[in-house]
């Protein structure tokens, strides 16, 4: 069994726990996820099964989008609803105030991750240090926010809803924290849902309950997306090479192409035969070099 599951992760469990539940439901050992989602967040969590784990890097460095709610008036240790209150503010920002501040959070930015995050500090996860009461001082890093839009502002309940489109590495909790500081009202994430990870969309995602039902009722892998699902932007070469050449590629051997091949300099590509995955290859100067070989 190999392929992708577009999982709709529920609130209350970690991404690692979601992976373990998928392992248990499908009775498979080789499972991974592309892009951690906080336990208190819900939404799209791409799950790689079997040989699809070899193409996980191509599912991580992609555009992501979120819907989230910021609660104003408080700053919390975790920058979400789970943390302890460390500061308060009586300021209630208006829609106009929020819209004026938003441009400062779009584009190439320097962002400091939350102290309660999976960022490594001297080989230890920051959240582990923070939980043990140790001082955590994280450095800022480059992130890219493509779009940040105010969807609604509820002054009566002092909260606001947003849509975010960004590249990898952006922490929504940091945006809520920094936006609250910018407005002088403080803030933290009250609700967070990821609605897109590259080609994976929320509207097509399935829950753990749906996965279990589909597996028990059919066992035909109807819930699995193909391995190449995350490689749609990569050049695909199907039934281009001979059986002998395919065998060499599967054995990790380089092969040289003659001038009859129009693909002799196409860079990174996905190779298959009969639409069965063979390998990710690099083809430069008429030489095919296997980069990732699929054992299917």
UniProtKB/Swiss-Prot annotation:
CDD domains: PseudoU_synth_EcTruB. Belongs to the pseudouridine synthase TruB family. Type 1 subfamily. Keywords: Isomerase, tRNA processing. Responsible for synthesis of pseudouridine from uracil-55 in the psi GC loop of transfer RNAs. It catalyses: uridine(55) in tRNA = pseudouridine(55) in tRNA. One of its GO terms (molecular function) is RNA binding. Gene3D superfamilies: Pseudouridine synthase. It comes from the Bacteria. GO terms for biological process: mRNA pseudouridine synthesis; tRNA pseudouridine synthesis. The lineage of its organism: Bacteria, Pseudomonadati, Pseudomonadota, Alphaproteobacteria, Rickettsiales. This is tRNA pseudouridine synthase B. SUPFAM superfamilies: Pseudouridine synthase.
């Amino acid at each position: 069994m190999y392929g992708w599951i577009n999982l709709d992760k529920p609130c209350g469990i970690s991404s690692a726990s979601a992976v373990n539940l998928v392992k248990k439901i499908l009775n498979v050992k080789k499972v991974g996820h592309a892009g951690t989602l906080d336990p208190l967040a819900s939404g799209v969590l791409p799950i790689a099964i079997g040989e699809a784990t070899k193409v996980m890097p191509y599912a991580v460095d992609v555009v992501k989008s979120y819907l989230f709610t910021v609660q104003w008036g408080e700053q919390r240790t975790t920058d979400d609803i789970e943390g302890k209150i460390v500061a308060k503010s009586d300021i209630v920002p208006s829609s106009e105030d929020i819209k004026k501040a938003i441009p400062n959070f779009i584009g190439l930015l320097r962002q400091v991750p939350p102290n309660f995050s999976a960022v490594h500090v001297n080989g230890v996860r920051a959240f582990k240090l923070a939980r043990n009461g140790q001082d955590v001082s994280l450095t800022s890093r480059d992130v890219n926010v493509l779009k940040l839009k105010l969807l609604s502002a509820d002054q009566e309940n002092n909260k606001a809803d947003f849509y975010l489109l960004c590249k990898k590495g952006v922490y929504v909790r940091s945006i809520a924290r920094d936006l609250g500081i910018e407005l002088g009202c403080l803030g933290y994430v009250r609700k967070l849902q990821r609605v897109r990870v590259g080609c994976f969309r929320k509207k097509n995602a399935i829950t753990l309950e749906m996965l279990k039902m589909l597996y028990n009722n059919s066992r035909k892998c109807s819930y699995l997306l193909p391995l190449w699902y995350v490689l749609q932007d990569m050049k695909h070469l199907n039934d281009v090479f001979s059986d002998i050449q395919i065998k060499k590629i599967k054995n990790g051997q380089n092969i040289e192409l003659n001038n009859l091949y129009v693909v002799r300099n196409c860079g990174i590509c996905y190779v298959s035969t009969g639409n069965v995955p063979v390998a990710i290859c690099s083809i430069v100067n008429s030489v095919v070099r296997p980069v990732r070989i699929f054992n299917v």
